Amino acid sequence: MWFLILFLALSLGGIDAAPPVQSRVVGGFKCEKNSQPWHVAVFRYNKYICGGVLLNPNWVLTAAHCYGNATSQYNVWLGKNKLFQREPSAQHRWVSKSFPHPDYNMSLLNDDIPQPKDKSNDLMLLRLSEPADITDAVKPIDLPTEEPKLGSTCLASGWGSITPTKWQKPNDLQCVFIKLLPNENCTKPYLHKVTDVMLCAGEMGGGKDTCAGDSGGPLICDGILHGITSWGPVPCGKPNAPAIYTKLIKFASWIKDTMAKNP
């Protein structure tokens, strides 16, 4: 059985990807080859579920809402530009253990009731079973050391849906430029809480956004990793409804401590 699962994961042929719960590029463009070498494709068994970010050869950061359950077998692909094609640059690694943030409310994963919710602390660390090889196509990115600046131009990337109203996944990794906005711009359009551990980013005129399947992927502002995709509007890219990203400067200590305690 495990051989079959591995074969399916390695071949990437006919993967029936489905958007994860509340997963969140619309209006973007094909990323330049190997321009996002820290971008990771996260799978549960042979199903693509989320994006991720390589922090060092042993650790990947993604969103907590990408969590399945305690017995889920995660694996990742690094160094990929095309999700459904074999590439010489690609590396496959199994995940030995997952670490969702302890303060993320896991009951949200099974709660579809339309009422105000707090989706704070939406991040999860994945410990790789063996280190990634650092190459031109696979490189880690550092955590932020200072607050992001409002108005910054940010780059989000992912293999999420490229259409706002239906699940249409691309083969090529997509990039989109969006603006870092005051959190107040995200409080009005949403029922859910927007807290100080979140970032608000997008285009107030709409049309550019992360979307279903982009969750856990990086938000890089002024060349610095400042967030990972968390949640946003339905449909994606709505005017006056920017998306929400986990604010990583608020979690740098937890990330570093977790990695240090689990070498």
Curated annotation (Swiss-Prot):
Entry EC number(s): 3.4.21.35
Keywords recorded for this protein, A-Z: Disulfide bond, Glycoprotein, Hydrolase, Protease, Serine protease, Signal, Zymogen
Propeptide: 18-24
Role summary: Glandular kallikreins cleave Met-Lys and Arg-Ser bonds in kininogen to release Lys-bradykinin.
A Pfam family assignment: Trypsin
SMART domains hit by this protein: Tryp_SPc (SM00020)
Enzyme class: hydrolase
Catalyzed chemical reaction(s): Preferential cleavage of Arg-|-Xaa bonds in small molecule substrates. Highly selective action to release kallidin (lysyl-bradykinin) from kininogen involves hydrolysis of Met-|-Xaa or Leu-|-Xaa
Positions annotated with a glycan in the UniProt record: 69, 105, 185
Domain Peptidase S1: 25-260
GO MF entry, a single one: serine-type endopeptidase activity
Signal peptide: 1-17
Annotated S-S bridges: 31-175, 50-66, 154-221, 186-200, 211-236
Family according to the record: Belongs to the peptidase S1 family. Kallikrein subfamily.
InterPro entries noted in UniProt: Peptidase_S1_PA, Peptidase_S1_PA_chymotrypsin, Peptidase_S1A, Trypsin_dom, TRYPSIN_HIS, TRYPSIN_SER
Active site residues per record: 65, 122, 215
Protein name from the UniProt record: Kallikrein 1-related peptidase b24
A single GO BP: proteolysis
